[in-house]
């Protein structure tokens, strides 16, 4: 059984219009939400073996603040491919390329990628969580998905079970 955590970056700031989209940092709300999500991950036994994150500043900050809540450092890779949206197939293939022992695997990215990926991968699971996820995938929201497969290379759409969908306001 493999476990995937799909985390949308925390709330970002639009205050400095001179910054490119890639450079936008977290705002105060995002700075408060990310550690709460990290604590939730740790306290519920979902600490990842590997984190893959977008290279955008807001995703990097989210990754750092979440990871600071883990009991020990976790291997982390920052990938440009998780910033540039080119359909859900790009992140899906990135996940498929990971070593099988790297579970839980956490991906930190952006919408619409995280929302589409979570929706496409899940075919079953907690009905209330699925409804909440399909309604809106807010910033710093986390989908926890189980797959009854032995290898990430076997990952297909619709085979995941949504275990939980967590929003920062619920923590």
Show the residue positions of the predicted features.
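Domain-level recognition of soluble alpha/beta enzyme cores
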Residues: 122-163
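Residue-level preference for the first positions of well-ordered beta-strands
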Residues: 4, 104-106, 142
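Glycine-rich phosphate-binding loop signature in dinucleotide/nucleotide-binding domains
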Residues: 44-46, 97-103
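Active-site-proximal alpha-helix that buttresses catalytic centers in soluble enzyme cores
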Residues: 2-86, 93, 137
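Conserved histidine-centered catalytic loops in small-molecule metabolism enzymes
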Residues: 49-69, 148-171
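Short glycine-enriched nucleophile-adjacent loop
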Residues: 67, 118, 122
């Amino acid at each position: 059984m493999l476990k995937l955590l799909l985390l949308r970056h925390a709330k970002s700031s639009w205050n400095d219009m001179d910054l490119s989209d890639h450079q936008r940092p977290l705002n105060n709300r995002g700075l408060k939400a990310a550690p709460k999500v990290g604590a939730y991950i740790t306290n519920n036994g979902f600490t990842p073996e590997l984190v893959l994150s977008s290279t955008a500043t807001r995703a990097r900050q989210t990754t750092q603040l979440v990871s600071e809540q883990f009991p020990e450092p976790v291997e982390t890779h920052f990938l440009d491919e998780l910033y540039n949206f080119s359909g859900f197939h790009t992140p899906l293939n990135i996940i498929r390329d990971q070593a099988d022992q790297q579970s839980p695997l956490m991906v930190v990215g952006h919408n619409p990628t995280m929302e589409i990926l979570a929706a496409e991968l899940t075919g079953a699971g907690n009905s209330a969580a699925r409804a909440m996820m399909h309604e809106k995938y807010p910033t710093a929201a986390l989908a926890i998905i189980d797959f009854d497969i032995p290898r990430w290379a076997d990952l297909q759409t619709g085979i995941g079970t949504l275990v939980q969908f967590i929003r920062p306001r619920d923590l």
